[in-house]
């Protein structure tokens, strides 16, 4: 029996989002975190079928569209990639909101989107750009020292922006699109160093995103973000920008309401600001997504790679 999975693809600043509209098994009616756990425990093969080759690629971020728990939410969503599941995804939320408009589900205005780490507020503007009011972001630790084999001592901040990040400003690497291989090798070594040293986020949270910053002549900063699974973010990374704002706010380098223009390694830009909150900040990230495909993924029973090429 052939299985069919309906998808709509978009990209946000070059970073793709694959919205799964239908075709996944029922995950029950619990919270997005509970449904994510069911998906991971019982139906993870659907994630790999959508994201891994031959139907996907390491760059893709998947977003499973779910019925929300709260009646005042526009949608629920579970984010995943080639290595597992994400608590929140900024660029993905922008892509989801833009796609919901394409589907005729929402119009311009403010919409609530349920995620596994909480409900985020997203505004679809008249020009179809999207502002995402993220979950609470905060810096967990400042100036953490780490020895990275092959590179020497490294210092960075640990911050939460919806995922855990290790943020490095003084790294000696050239943050540019033609230097991605070297940036990936460096960031991967840092992540391995963190794991080896037992350095984590709060409550033992795995630091699975590494963010490198550099000056940019046209914007406030340019960044390279290594995501779980060794793919780099083509967008400026919404959760990473949120983590960056948390550090800037903690250091008194960015005032509430001031706009921070964050460029990605390929030059796409998010505009970000924050309001102060108890225990950290609440950031808002604005960017644009563009639609790229509508498709039906076919899964044949006799296909040896029907659930993806799993390494």
UniProtKB/Swiss-Prot annotation:
Molecular-function annotations in GO: 4-hydroxyproline epimerase activity
Catalytic residues (UniProt): 89, 237
EC number from the UniProt entry: 5.1.1.8
Positions contributing to substrate binding: 90-91, 209, 233, 238-239
Superkingdom of origin organism: Bacteria
Catalytic activity: trans-4-hydroxy-L-proline = cis-4-hydroxy-D-proline
Gene3D superfamilies: Diaminopimelate Epimerase, Chain A, domain 1
Keywords of this entry: Isomerase
InterPro entries, per database record: Pro_racemase_fam
Enzyme category, top tier: isomerase
Family label: Belongs to the proline racemase family.
PANTHER family (alphabetical): TRANS-3-HYDROXY-L-PROLINE DEHYDRATASE
Entry function: Catalyzes the epimerization of trans-4-hydroxy-L-proline (t4LHyp) to cis-4-hydroxy-D-proline (c4DHyp). Is likely involved in a degradation pathway that converts t4LHyp to alpha-ketoglutarate. Displays no proline racemase activity.
UniProt protein name: 4-hydroxyproline 2-epimerase 1
Gene of this entry: prdF
